[in-house]
């Protein structure tokens, strides 16, 4: 008859308990708890970096290694988000400006700004639309709307005058006023047509 000694039984039980505890054969799993790391880099199977988190920001990349998204903190302490196109050029910006106001900017595939929606230097809201060369074509803000031609000359102004009355002004191609429709200084309605020949 074979005799199994007590030491072998204890070792067998301990190894079984160790395996069960290591592989987590429990009804509930434990959380990692408080995990502290300086940064996290995410790579695909080929070793191409697909994402990075650390130093106050997060950045993602496409399969070619070009940046696609940046979320982080700027030098002034404000937060911002930048989106990039497939070539790695910035296409959109959402964040905090130098003076603390928020804004959104979009860019074309040449890297030129095409629109701006946000707080201006005068702390009022504004919307600006740019042409493909980056020149202002439309402006809406602080109680008025302006439009510009391809030479940068104002063509339309719609807004409020210093006396509080509304008015519309149109301008010819060289920036000279051609029509005025609005409220005069005496609160009367006025229509003026100018001969700029």
Regions inferred by a protein language model and the residue ranges of each:
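Single-pass membrane-anchoring alpha-helices
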Residues: 1-28
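Parallel beta-helix/beta-solenoid repeats that form elongated, surface-exposed shafts/blades used
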Residues: 27-196
């Amino acid at each position: 008859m074979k005799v199994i000694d007590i030491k072998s039984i204890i070792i067998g039980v301990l190894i079984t308990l160790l395996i069960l505890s290591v592989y987590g054969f429990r009804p509930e799993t434990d959380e990692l708890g408080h995990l502290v790391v300086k940064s996290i880099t995410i790579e695909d199977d080929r070793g191409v970096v697909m994402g990075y988190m650390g130093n106050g920001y997060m950045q993602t990349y496409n399969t070619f290694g070009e940046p696609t998204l940046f979320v982080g903190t700027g030098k002034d302490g404000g937060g911002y988000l930048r989106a990039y196109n497939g070539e790695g050029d910035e296409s959109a910006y959402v964040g905090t400006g130098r003076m603390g106001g928020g804004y959104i900017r979009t860019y074309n595939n040449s890297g030129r700004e095409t629109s701006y929606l946000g707080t201006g230097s005068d702390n009022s809201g504004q919307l600006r639309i740019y042409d493909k060369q980056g020149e202002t074509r439309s402006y809406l803000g602080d109680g008025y709307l302006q439009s510009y031609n391809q030479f940068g000359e104002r063509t339309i102004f719609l807004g409020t005058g210093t006396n509080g009355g509304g008015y519309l002004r149109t301008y010819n191609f060289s920036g000279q006023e051609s029509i005025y429709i609005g409220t005069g200084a005496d609160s009367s309605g006025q229509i003026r047509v100018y001969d700029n020949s």
